[in-house]
A protein has these predicted regions:
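Generic detector of short, locally flexible boundary/turn motifs and exposed helical patches
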Residues: 2-3, 28-32, 45-52, 121-122
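The catalytic Nudix box helix
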Residues: 37-69
């Protein structure tokens, strides 16, 4: 599969905890939090790319997530689709791929603040 030059797709997941609170999937890199970012492969849709990334890299059971929203964000002047999913804590493994963590809503707001998001996702 050929990678399209510098085209990416972003994603996050809202995790519904058993106590009723929520956490969000983020990538922690160099003391910075960001969305999960996947390179777009030729012949695959943005949705297929992010689902494959979440499954293979982040170790999410993608059969147990629901698509909530699709919006657009800009990362370094690049137009990047942002997929937002949700899932229940009981449906996911505790351990995520390297660098991926579940963060509190306040931290997610700070992640959103670092991007130019068209139509802030509703969650």
């Amino acid at each position: 599969m050929e990678i399209l030059a510098s085209k990416r797709v972003a994603g996050t997941i809202m995790l519904h905890l058993e106590d009723g609170s929520k956490k969000f999937l983020v990538h922690s890199i160099d003391d910075k939090l960001e969305f999960a970012l996947a390179e777009l492969s030729e012949g695959k849709t943005g949705l297929a790319n992010i689902l494959n990334f979440l499954k293979e890299i982040v170790h999410i059971d993608v059969s147990k997530i629901s698509w909530m929203e699709l919006t657009n964000t800009h990362i370094n002047q690049e137009n990047v689709p942002l997929f937002v999913f949700e899932t229940e804590q009981k449906n996911q493994r505790e351990e995520l791929g390297e660098g991926y963590i579940w963060e509190e809503p306040g931290q997610m707001r700070s992640v959103l603040g670092t991007y130019e998001v068209e139509g802030v996702p509703f969650f």
